[in-house]
Design a protein with these regions (language model features):
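TRAFAC-class small GTPase G-domain
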Residues: 1-170
Length: 170
């Protein structure tokens, strides 16, 4: 299937928040229980058809460790959507979101759609970041917001379609 449009999405955030599983869930509809740190970047692509037009969605999973930050910054260029991910059960990953958002605003096109993603809602009993905190941060920074459970794919595909539709309309 030949595509008409190439759209680049990036996934950013601290290490171990679920970025690699977000890529795996969207591209292959799978979840990997075994954690491994991304070294540099990982990449996946998928063609989708909307209103008779074929879009190739490239999703770039960036390393969350500070060691690789200078390498991963190069991948912000030409992104149409940035998923900024944190772990709802790990306060530090939310506290670090500000720096990821600043990088995104500085290095991505001005038109980039930013989506704040609170992951691991299956760990509700260990929640350290309230839904309200995430929602307020997203509003203040002009971002869309969602909480997901990548383990089951809850909300992810529906939300990726919403982000894509928003881009297509604009």
């Amino acid at each position: 299937m030949n595509f008409l449009y190439l759209l680049k999405f990036i996934i950013i955030g601290d290490s171990a928040v679920g970025k690699s599983n977000m890529l795996l869930r969207y591209i292959h509809d799978r979840f990997n229980e075994d954690f491994h740190s991304t070294i540099g970047v990982e990449f996946g692509a998928k063609n989708i058809q909307i209103d008779g037009k074929v879009f190739r969605i490239q999703i770039w999973d960036t390393a969350g460790q500070e060691t690789f930050r200078s390498i991963t910054r190069a991948y912000y260029k030409n992104s149409v959507c940035a998923f900024v991910v944190y772990d709802i059960s790990n306060r530090a990953t939310f506290d670090n979101i500000k720096s990821w958002v600043e990088d995104c605003k500085r290095l991505s096109p001005k038109t980039v759609l930013m989506v704040l993603v609170g992951n691991k809602i299956d760990l509700e009993e260990r929640r350290e970041v309230s839904y309200n905190e995430g929602s307020i941060f997203a509003q203040k920074n002009g971002m869309l917001f969602l909480n997901v459970r990548l383990k089951l794919g809850i909300m992810l595909n529906k939300f990726l379609w919403k982000a894509l539709e928003k881009f297509i309309k604009e």
